[in-house]
């Protein structure tokens, strides 16, 4: 009987632990969606500040093009930074493995 209770407790623990991890992932996903939408709002606000009633179509397109280039440059910078951090993480993992072994 005690083994049955222990097994049931273990299953309940695993179930709750998995649920907790799923909730953490969902919260992280929702936070990312909130950040993305806040960035979109900021982008539209910025665009609204640059566009004036006297501008023609070509001037507006130029502003959008420049903003797009700026964001693409930022993405490139983030990709490089991410690669550098990944390399450092791999190096630390190797060093930690050597310490443990």
From Swiss-Prot:
GO terms for cellular component: cytosol. InterPro entries: DUF496. Keywords: Coiled coil, Cytoplasm. It comes from the Bacteria. It is found in: Cytoplasm. Residues 68-95 form a coiled coil. Pfam families: DUF496. Signal peptide: none annotated. Its main location: cytoplasm. Belongs to the pole-localizer TmaR family. Pole-localizer protein involved in the regulation of several cellular processes. This is Pole-localizer protein TmaR. It comes from Buchnera aphidicola subsp. Schizaphis graminum (strain Sg). The lineage of its organism: Bacteria, Pseudomonadati, Pseudomonadota, Gammaproteobacteria, Enterobacterales. The gene is tmaR.
């Amino acid at each position: 009987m005690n083994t049955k209770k222990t097994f049931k407790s273990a299953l309940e623990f695993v179930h709750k632990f998995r649920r907790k991890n799923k909730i953490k992932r969902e919260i992280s996903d929702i936070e990312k969606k909130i950040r993305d939408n806040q960035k979109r709002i900021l982008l539209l606000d910025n665009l609204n500040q640059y566009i004036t009633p006297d501008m023609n179509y070509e001037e507006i397109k130029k502003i959008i093009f420049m903003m797009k280039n700026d964001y693409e440059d930022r993405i490139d910078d983030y990709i490089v930074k991410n690669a550098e951090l990944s390399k450092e993480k791999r190096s630390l993992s190797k060093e930690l493995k050597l310490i443990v072994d």
